[in-house]
Amino acid sequence: RRQRQMCIRDSRRIWCFDGDGAVIMHMGSMAIIGSKQPKNYIHVVFNNGAHDSVGGQPTVGLDIDLPGIARSVRYNAVHTVSDMNGLKKVLSDIRLEDGPVLLEVKVRKGNRKDLGRPTTTPIQNKEAFMGFLQDKELN
């Protein structure tokens, strides 16, 4: 069965949103991304130095150089921001850059008390995403 490689074959921008904990646990994926050089790939890492979504355990995210790691595995552009003005400027710059691009957004630990939770299961999300990709392949 032929697999669709959405970043390599698609002209649309692909945005991957990660936390620093996930990036650290799956760092090998950055090397694969760098080696494949997808021009439409933007990797946004929210770095708060913690596994916030699963209890707030500390990570080394704020102690290591994630942009330097991205450069060393051949990301074409890297950015770090820590405030809204910097984010707005970088987002306009990213639109003109070829990927892979890393955007590290340094954020505070914690979340809003009124933050909603997902209403669909992971399997439902997977099936909806697969259906979306199949629809796009037919067009």
Task: Describe every region a protein language model picked out.
Residues 13-93:
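Conserved thiamine diphosphate
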Residues 1-8:
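Short, small-residue-biased leader/transition segments that mark boundaries at the very start
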Residues 10, 37, 73-74:
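Short, structured coil segments at secondary-structure junctions
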Residues 12-16, 41, 97-105:
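Generic beta-sheet signal
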Residues 52-54, 89-90, 110-116:
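Short active-site-adjacent structural elements
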Residues 97-139:
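Glycine/aspartate-rich loop-and-adjacent alpha/beta segment that forms the canonical ThDP
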Residues 45, 82, 105-107:
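Short secondary-structure boundary segments
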